[in-house]
């Protein structure tokens, strides 16, 4: 935990953060956190607008963009954190051990959140969001330290092509031919072989949406973030040319993703190569737009609202996972039976006024605001909780 260096005490200005920070990155990360909380905590999971749900299998909704946005921004953050230290190889050992420690902490937090809801070690889910972020962060840090950008570009291409070949041309050891069917593809088989069904996502049972094999292409998402971060961090380049280059990268990535989708479908659970390109392109465009508005044109008056989340992203994530459980431990009588605290709020406050879908989303918005106010206390005190 550390105090942020302050240039002003006014919370309406992003000058409270260190000047070396990319303000648009804090904003964009915070916006992603807000979106994540919104889609993860509907008032009623049975009444949700389609864009606020994950795709059933192939395809990509706005909700499917949240996770790759996080990994993409991990890549950008790696550049901003390590670019000045990378040249001195004596620093590498310390950086690697620090990255390893962070990976282990993230894995520990992810497992602890699961045990908070379901204290059953016999069915402890090993894969998870924070677990993947930790592993991808560590491996991407190693790649960034030990390679140049040209090598990383080639590695990204190798990852995307090799993953396509593995899933589409290697037979599944249990006897199935190469396929992309949820329960029968190679990635699902690997998860069952490594974790067993007792330690995977209990709602899918035979495969895990954050599985082991699909972590390989997830590294590609972070490498895209490193590529964009290197361009943003580079000094001495006209910012208009820099933004134009990034927009071109973003559009090209989206187009390549859509072309690849024709033979390797965009799929979040498999984290297909087309999904890496498509989601990475959208994130590139979004971050570039934020960079141009906030860091170039200096329209920063209201950016702090989302930076509250962005600066303390891990804290916001953990709270958004734990607080609903605490609220739902409270059972409230309703129409002859008891309902959870979150569901009660939805039924009593919003459902009598709005349609079920609107009541569900308004309930989620209130929860976003609740978590925001908790994190705002840290922001106000200039406290950043780091791992």
Explain the meaning of each model-derived region.
Residues 2-387:
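Alpha-helical transmembrane segments and their immediate juxtamembrane cytosolic regions
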